[in-house]
Amino acid sequence: VTYVVCTDGSKGTSDRDITSEQLSEIRQKEQINAGKVIGLKDVVFLGYPDGYLEPSLSLRKDIAREIRKHKPGILICPYSMRSLDGPFQGSGHPDHIASGEATLSAVFPSARGHLTFPDLLQEGLEPWAVKEVWIVGHPSPDLFIDISSEFEKSVLALLEHKSQMSLSDDEVRQRLTGWKGNKAHSNSNFGFKGRAHGKGMKYAESFKRLRY
């Protein structure tokens, strides 16, 4: 598994004593450490400024380059629209929305078309057709993956992002499970336990699956 991180993480803080450059360095290290927890093969940083991401041709080309380079059969990306329903009530990060749109446009047609971004061919990167895209955060997921055996890794990986945490370890765990009081939230996008609700699993991750 390879992660492609579009932005430099230089803006996500309320600490006025830290610079964008310092924060970017911290967050890059945190992402690498989180990747090690879950056994990533590689983490690629595209370096776009945090908070200002747009689904530009430049971003689409950079993502298409990584697709051709790593040749994924399944690609996972954020939902490319702002959902006003569900537990997050329209609070989706604009960078996530932009990266989702750029990724879908890179998957089709940019990564698979030899006449699109022909300079990628000059870099030795042949076209590649992704078979499936799994969308994170879609309001109507149709694919549920049992992650019960990997749940602890998910918790530990998230806890590596210390600069982004204002919650205790127990509070983070509670948010991830999707428990509210003593009851699991039934919304399929709310916590790993909520996503598993009624599906014979303890914890699940949910996606909208697109086949090409």
Show the residue positions of the predicted features:
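Active-site rim/loop-helix segments in enzyme catalytic domains that contact anionic ligands
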Residues: 1-71
